[in-house]
Curated annotation (Swiss-Prot):
Recorded name of the encoding gene: cobB
HAMAP family: CobB_CbiA (MF_00027)
GO biological process: cobalamin biosynthetic process
Organism of this sequence: Brucella anthropi (strain ATCC 49188 / DSM 6882 / CCUG 24695 / JCM 21032 / LMG 3331 / NBRC 15819 / NCTC 12168 / Alc 37)
Active site, renumbered: 327
Name of the protein: Hydrogenobyrinate a,c-diamide synthase
């Protein structure tokens, strides 16, 4: 499988729009695509899937073992993909607190040439210094092409190309400023793909723009040589929560990693889905229930009125079924959730937890988790935390994890457990050890 990475000097440069437009344009050309998102982001992969028609995997060089990244890449090849298109996160060299786990690390690991998307809106000749610095910063990462974004005029484009010419890095195209290529945002990033009012028209317009302003034939010449990956079957995976896992899935519970489901299915686990917003209950024969993260704060009123959903979860918990919630799912397992307007909505009441968005506080970063006694997890884990919720009250039930940050500093214990019900704000990505 061949591939390349779309990256940028900083967030907000336009790499997501460029990636989506290229995915749709390459799909039109009949390419067998494997979309990838670097890092822990949940939202962009849904856009990648909409643009390409193919499931997008997160590949996270900080939180995932290298052999898992290789195995997931192998799985894409097994599924018939021939071209891996990766979108970076933040700036190319940005990662955890110590810089590890960057998009550049993923490009190096997978031997991907990098196409750098540069926001040119407020610069001309200075672009040469920026691109030269990025091309020289790490010799193990190849900047193979440049896409000029938000170019103001043909004169502006000529100045930019002239400044870059001595660097001998191909300029693959110049995209004009176009407000129609902006994606709507909210506090955790982009609005979810399923909530975009006219996503298909946006993707078609983005693809038309890429086909008009980017030399796709020149892009094809920089795709990396084929690379072999380790077989998925040889790589241990994260232990599943049960033999039949019922997963909440709708606009309130949309943040679940595709690689977790892929790994669990390969271990023979049955996965079924239900919609709390549709007032659906998990299947009675499930021996585990997973409430992933999402935006329950935007739907708290509907969740509070979802009687069948609430009764189904409470009944399962009473039978000793494993019930596990992450971030938004953790908040829903609590007693109440206060929305941004300060209105408190009753939740499931299975954990002594009250949360609020009336006074937002950012919690962000990679985490290493040591499961405590009674946790449904049995091995040290790598995870990510990203939310704006404030804890109003957290009871004295058993804690779930001992937590360290990305550089190893102890940040205390986190999560709650009462019987078979547990949860925390941490999004589990992979395990740290060598055995599942």
């Amino acid at each position: 499988m061949k591939g390349f990475m779309i990256a940028a000097p900083a967030s907000g440069s336009g790499k997501t729009t460029v990636t989506l437009g290229l995915l749709r344009a390459l799909k039109r050309r009949g390419e067998a695509l494997a979309p990838v998102k670097a890092g822990p982001d949940y939202i962009d992969p849904a856009y990648h899937k909409a643009a390409s028609g193919v499931d997008c995997f997160n590949l996270d060089p900080w939180a995932m073992r290298p052999e898992l990244i290789s195995a997931l890449s192998s799985r894409m090849t097994e599924s018939g993909a021939r071209l891996l298109v990766a979108e970076g996160m933040m700036g190319l060299f940005d990662g955890a607190m110590d810089g590890k786990g960057s998009s550049a690390d993923l490009a190096r690991l997978l031997d991907l040439p990098v196409v750098l998307v540069v926001d040119c809106a407020r610069q001309s000749h200075s672009i040469a210094a920026l691109v030269w610095g990025f091309s020289q910063f790490r010799k193990d990462v190849l900047i193979a092409g440049i896409i000029l974004n938000r170019v103001g005029s043909s004169r502006h484009e000529a100045m930019l190309r002239g400044a870059l010419e001595p660097l001998r890095i191909p300029v693959l195209g110049a995209l004009p400023r176009d407000t129609a290529l902006s994606l709507p945002e909210r506090h955790l990033g982009l609005v979810q793909a399923g909530e975009h009012s006219d996503l298909e028209s946006f993707l078609e317009h983005a693809a038309d723009t890429m086909e008009t302003h980017i030399d796709l034939d020149a892009l094809q010449t920089i795709w990396s040589r084929p690379k072999r990956f380790d077989a998925m079957a040889n790589v241990p995976r994260l232990k599943p929560l049960g033999n039949h896992i019922a997963v909440a899935r709708d606009d309130a519970f949309a943040f679940a990693y595709a690689h977790l489901f892929e790994g669990w299915r390969r271990r023979g686990v049955e996965i079924s889905f239900f919609s709390p917003l549709g007032d659906e209950s998990p299947r009675q024969d499930a021996d585990a229930i997973y409430l992933p993260g999402g935006y329950p704060e935007l739907h708290a009123g509907r969740l509070a009125q979802a009687g069948r959903f609430q009764a189904g979860i409470r009944e399962a918990a009473a039978r000793g079924v494993t019930v596990y919630g992450e971030c938004g799912g953790y908040m829903v397992l609590g007693e109440s959730l206060q929305d941004a307007e300060g209105v408190a909505h009753p939740m499931l009441g299975l954990l002594q937890l009250e949360t609020s968005f009336a006074k937002r506080k950012l919690h962000l970063g990679y985490r290493v988790l040591e499961p405590l006694e009674g946790s449904p997890w049995t091995e040290p884990l790598k995870a990510h935390e990203f939310h704006y919720a404030s804890i109003v009250r957290e009871g004295k039930a058993d804690r779930l994890f001992r937590v360290r940050d990305a550089v190893g500093d102890d940040v205390g214990e986190a999560g709650l457990r009462v019987g078979s019900v547990s949860g925390s704000f941490m999004h589990v990505i992979d395990f740290c050890g060598e055995k599942a």
